[in-house]
Amino acid sequence: GAALPGIESALNRSLVAVSAEAVGALEVMLQKTVEYSKTRKQFGTAIGTFQALQHRMADMFIQCQLARSIVIMAAMSLDSDDSSVEKTKAVAAAKSRVGRAIKSVGQEAIQIHGGIAMTEELDVGHFFKRVTALDLAYGDGDYHTQRFAAL
């Protein structure tokens, strides 16, 4: 009964924290992917000069910025005068958006790095594993899309 608002508040704050951590990790993955594309050579030239890969990295950047923006909005809503339902909707939207960004940015980073991305020597694989775990924490993006729709 009376504890429910406190539990909802704690859950929403936890979801924002998990989402923010994921956004930070995604931005590192993007940065490392761009750096790698400048040094990895194929056909005698850096793969970062290939327009198709530039487009993919631009899409990764867009996904990171979308996720960052909505997480900031959700964090701001937690300290606002919005109703509990509005706060929960903002948080669910953020977790949903971050879940989609995790899939998009994570998979692109792994593909651009190639097989080396999943070795223990390269930290992109570690980041990918971490963001995958963060996506599943407190319900994945699909769950929060349904949660948002139900509110």
Question: Could you say what each language-model-derived stretch is?
Answer:
Residues 9-151:
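Alpha-helical interface subdomain recognition
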Residues 1-5:
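Long, acidic (Asp/Glu-rich), low-complexity accessory segments flanking structured domains
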